[in-house]
């Protein structure tokens, strides 16, 4: 039975929560990750894992994704919510605080041939930094 776009996205989210290191079961090798300033754009699964997923995983442990709503339209899925995590590693120059924080996000996923080919994401960095004691607006 063929999985729906939404099933693939939800399975990937569950794998990231479990901190599975090999993302190749969920993402194409030439996967594009396009994010707001602070995350940047990552071309290919290797760059995504090396330059975003691993540093994020190392900085924030005990992750739980609390996605509030999903939408699906053909080979596209979208969601918004937050990731609850404990800050236990360096993040954007901030030493570990041990704080449990919420990381707000919005994601748009494109699935091709049963794997994620593209992710457009917005992460609320001002909200993250404020929870870590850095108010960038003051």
Question: What are the roles of these predicted feature ranges?
Answer:
Residues 6-8, 21, 25-75, 82-84:
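A solvent-exposed, acidic/Ser-Thr-rich amphipathic alpha-helical stretch
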Residues 118-138:
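Low-complexity, intrinsically disordered terminal/linker segments enriched in charged
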Residues 81-83, 121-122:
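Short, well-ordered beta-to-alpha junction loops that form the rim of enzyme active sites
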Residues 1-29, 135-138:
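Short, low-complexity N-terminal intrinsically disordered segments enriched in polar/charged residues
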Residues 70-78, 110-117:
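A short, structured loop/turn motif at beta-sheet edges
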Residues 86-112:
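Exposed beta-sheet edge and beta->alpha loop/turn motif
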Residues 3, 11-15, 51, 68-69, ...:
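A structural feature that tracks compact, well-ordered secondary-structure segments
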Residues 78-80, 92:
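Intrinsic, low-complexity N-terminal interaction/targeting segments
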